[in-house]
Amino acid sequence: MEKIASFTVNHLDLKTGIYVSRKDRLGPITLTTFDLRFTKPNTEPVMVTAGIHSIEHLGATFLRNHPKWKDNVIYFGPMGCRTRFYLILAGDLTSSDIIGLLCELADYVLGYEGEIPGYSPRDCGNYLDNNLDMAKYYMRKYKSEVLDNPTEDRLNYPQ
């Protein structure tokens, strides 16, 4: 079998960042998959599931309710490697196109207080696995490393 595109990226040179992982055509619509890389692969510890899970719930809620972007949100969720999230949006987009959206998302998570949306046994299959403080830690780190000063090496995969 042919190696899939995401396995051809040199993870040894990869930094935290906002990367276009792939673009797919669905009829007349382009779907852009973003790799929101929160930790440096194989160097930093992977994210703990409770923090990831909290970002997933808050992120999905924020993005699917965003006045400008909600109709373009296809998917937001973590990857199994626990170093990143995937964000799939309708549109032929670049990493630079979504910096503002991700800054708003970061501010939402960092300012969030109270019960996390969807955390009940009725609404979530693993509702006890959450940690808002850890989610804020990861988001603060991502904002500082990537969003506050988005350089080219954090917006485009290394060659």
Predicted segment positions?
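His/Glu-rich zincin catalytic helix
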Residues: 1-63
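Histidine-acidic residue clusters that define the catalytic metal-binding segment
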Residues: 144-159
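Arginine residue identity/basic-tract feature
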Residues: 22-25, 37, 64, 82-84, ...
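M16/MPP (pitrilysin/insulinase) zinc-metallopeptidase core fold and M16-derived inactive scaffolds
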Residues: 41, 45-97
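Generic preference for flexible, low-structure residues
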Residues: 20, 50-52, 68, 92, ...
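Active-site-adjacent, His/Asp/Glu-enriched structural segments that form or flank metal-binding
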Residues: 75-148
